[in-house]
Amino acid sequence: MIPALKIRQPIEPWEKFLTDSITTPEELSLLTETEESDIHKVISEYPMFINPYFLGLIKEKGDAIYRQAVPDIREISKLEGFVDPLNEEGLSPVQGLTHKYPDRVLFLVSGRCAMYCRFCNRKRKVGRASMVTRETIREGLSYIKSTKDIRDVLLSGGDPLLLSDKELFKILSELRSISHVETIRIGTRIPCSLPHRVTKQLAGMLKGFHPLYINTHFNHPAEITPQAASACSLLAEAGIPLGCQTVLLKGVNDDGMLIKELMLKLLAIRVRPYYLFQADLARGTSHFWTALKKGLGIMAELQGNISGLGIPRFMIDLPEGGGKIPITPEYIRGIKGDELVVKNYLGDEYRYPIIDHGDQKGYTGHKAEYK
């Protein structure tokens, strides 16, 4: 009897980008022997993976896209920071799930990314086969089912959108069957790093799981291409609210005018700027860290110079699992009597009444007479 042949399903076009991704320095052009040697040293600890689409966004060696994707010897020569900067492992009741806040969890459902970001706060996990398994997903779902306080689940990884439609459908269906889970969020860089993955079929499938929110991750205006815009359009047309979590990175986007351009371009493709993160204190990423005053200065530049829709919240994710906190430019100068003294985006001081409106004292906000 002739055994039946196992018929392999044809790969999707977007999967070809993954199979053609580069993982060694020899596949990069314009590198010196020293640079190739340095990259080999780095990838022995922190792997490299760059798909052809994202590689094509690099215009010259050392530009903003290059810095995000190509390994740098400083990843292993500068050892500041934490291996697990947010204490995700310490706050993990089961492998692959972090329960930091009372009503929500971070659930890792994929160990794959379309490219390995050199500033990743999960560098300790990237490229490891054990990062996510069927067993960790099963245990995560079981924990969510048994923990009634959980109303919000954030899917992350790796990148959840690199699961097949079938795999993602199964996980989302399981979550939607849990009565106390109200909101599902997906954290993904796919609209930026491999927008071809966002197909009509994927968007149509996701549409069936509302309320579903997606936060994506663009760091530079050069990442907003026609392909990225098309991917975001498909998701938006499926009724999925889109936000963006940008990371402030030295040598990539630590400039107020550039961040303003990025925020405006995000709005144009129907993505709401959500967070601007101070880079996490992950080991191997210190060459990307910016001074806190840099981020505060950028936020001050945005205020009054761009619509409120385009202003993200400047956030720090505290080390050791302290959680996210907003950091804002200081607009309050003090209190004079019954008035709050503040400055506007131009630096002019104003007074604003701090009494109850029902006091009927006739107070109105006005420009301060002093500077």
Can you annotate each of these PLM segments?
Residues 1-100:
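Flexible, acidic/Gly-rich N-terminal and inter-domain linker regions that tether
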Residues 38-39, 125-131, 158-159, 189:
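Flexible, glycine/proline-enriched loop segments at strand-loop-helix junctions
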Residues 54, 117, 274:
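Conserved, mostly hydrophobic/aromatic
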Residues 92-95, 104-108, 138-145:
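Short, charged beta->alpha transition segments
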Residues 99-134, 186:
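Canonical Radical SAM [4Fe-4S] cluster-binding loop centered on the CxxxCxxC motif
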Residues 119-120, 148, 229-254, 339, ...:
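Mobile, glycine- and charge-enriched loop segments
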Residues 138-145, 149-150, 161-306:
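Conserved AdoMet/S-adenosylmethionine-binding subsite of the radical SAM
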Residues 299-371:
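C-terminal accessory regions of radical SAM enzymes
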